[in-house]
């Protein structure tokens, strides 16, 4: 049973929308890829564990324990807190001196020692808050195409079978009030806003216009002649109202400012009259007539 799930990281949402619209720095391209792959791996674990009602599960917590530390999953069951670190590496790797190196040269450093350090810090958190459950930390490689090709003695590279076995273990026990109380205490100390947010933004006026599909993130052609629904080649469907709202939301994020109906029209081939009608209903209005701009209602202050 999940009592906290993760939203897609704001930095990933931003870079995902920028990708394909303008030239991104090499640093941001790497960051985008790592965030995307990491989120997809965590989502895979969430989708599997979310099938079960036993066990108390938490997805994505940042704690301040002598510095900010991000934990992928906590699973609390039968007097044990499982601390899961999820890796979504793909392809063939060699393991040496604590590091994983891919055939393309990518290096994942201190794979297990970093996890042990995070466990030690969480133990300190538990001691401070009088939590006496056993702590078990595991690094789990969830991509079925991940493989360590050299011989490594004494180290276990857990895969999705470890998650399946954990689910079976969860199903053997009922949730207790203490399980829930500990989970709620952990969530209470969650840092909502990370220090690792996007700091450098790209100029909107240099970006390619156009709506992207919320599912596959490819550019989506929205034609005025469409009757009721816009259908992406991936199968995702949107109403015209949803397309207008999606375009507005993403433009506002990319501009980091208020939005005009004309700017939305640059993304979706729908009449400005229809766009204004939708924005008037769902957004906060600034100004009148042709100079009118719009903001999300939760950002009007």
Name each model-derived stretch:
Residues 1-69, 80, 105-281, 299-301:
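Surface-exposed interaction regions that form or flank ligand-binding interfaces
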Residues 53, 91, 96-99, 153-155, ...:
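Generic structural motif recognizing short loop/turn segments at the entrances and edges of beta-strands
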Residues 72:
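Cell-envelope/extracellular polymer assembly enzymes that use nucleotide-activated donors
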Residues 75, 230-232, 294-295:
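Short beta-strand element of the conserved SAM-dependent methyltransferase core
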Residues 75-99:
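Active-site beta-strand-loop-beta-strand hairpin of nuclease catalytic cores
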Residues 93, 283-285:
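Assembly/interface hotspot detector across virion components, adhesins/toxins, and nucleic-acid enzymes
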Residues 286-301:
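Short Lys/Arg-enriched helix C-cap and helix-to-coil transition segments
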